[in-house]
Amino acid sequence: FEDLKNCYSENEEYASAIDHLSLNQKSFYDTNYDPLHENRVDEPVSPNPYENSEESNFTLEDSSDSSAVVLTSAHGEVLKKRRLSLNQTMSNEDLEAIANDSEEEIIEPWSVPYSFQSNLKFKYQRSIKKGAVITDAMHQSLIRESNGQHLKAMHVVDRKHEVKFDIDGYVSTATRIRPVTLKISKTQLYVCAQEEGQPVLLKE
């Protein structure tokens, strides 16, 4: 009993000493203080559109061979889409991870002037990827239109409708630019650029 009393007395003295510390001093173990994450006035802060769960919700799309979890905004806009196998289960933590997952880097198109194209010759270097599936920032996949000459992007659940591409790389001794070609797998149809706003054209 005397030992316990002495320990209690020592704890009281320690607590009293702590109370006299300056409020401006931050403990090494104070998890609420992190100078590395302070917002500066001169640095813009990018809002995360997925942080407020009240503005978005999840839905489940089912098909005969696969399922997909779709995150939509309050206005019905599809923000993200993730495919699931039929036997895969989702927890609240999994849904939160999907919502907070940072977006993949969006590749911006760059058009080469026709005069530049005609002055250079490129030769085949290597195959970069076989059977690649290409999606946009909204996780829409490319499918072929009914006429077979154009591609369009849309959300699909049945993966057999997705177009798969072979990506090949080319080089030239006159420039460091290394262009690539997109060809539909198991065909001789190549993706050809058209004017802005026009559908993607396929040519042999």
From Swiss-Prot:
Keyword Iron applies = no
Residue ranges of region Disordered? 34-64
Residue ranges under compositional bias (Polar residues)?
49-64
Alphabetically sorted, this entry's keywords are: Cytokine, Cytoplasm, Glycoprotein, Inflammatory response, Mitogen, Phosphoprotein, Pyrogen, Secreted
**Can you tell me which residues are glycosylated?**
57, 87, 100
- Going by the entry's taxonomy, the superkingdom of the source organism is recorded as Eukaryota
Q: What's a BP term from Gene Ontology annotated to this protein?
A: immune response
| UniProt KW Cell inner membrane keyword | no
GO terms assigned for molecular function: copper ion binding; cytokine activity; interleukin-1 receptor binding
Question: Which parts of this protein are propeptide?
Answer: 1-110
In this UniProt entry, the residues modified to Phosphoserine are 85
Q: Which cysteines are joined by disulfide bonds?
A: none
> By its UniProt entry, which InterPro entries does this protein fall under?
IL-1_alpha (IPR003295), IL-1_fam (IPR000975), IL-1_propep (IPR003502), IL1/FGF (IPR008996)
Q: Which GO terms describe its cellular component?
A: cytosol; extracellular space
Family statement: Belongs to the IL-1 family.
Q: Supply the PANTHER family for this chain.
A: INTERLEUKIN-1 ALPHA, INTERLEUKIN-1 FAMILY MEMBER
Provide the domain comment. Answer: The similarity among the IL-1 precursors suggests that the amino ends of these proteins serve some as yet undefined function.
What's the subunit arrangement here? Answer: Monomer. Interacts with TMED10; the interaction mediates the translocation from the cytoplasm into the ERGIC (endoplasmic reticulum-Golgi intermediate compartment) and thereby secretion.
Provide the protein name.
Interleukin-1 alpha
Q: Which organism is it from?
A: Cavia porcellus
Instruction: Name the lineage.
Output: Eukaryota, Metazoa, Chordata, Craniata, Vertebrata
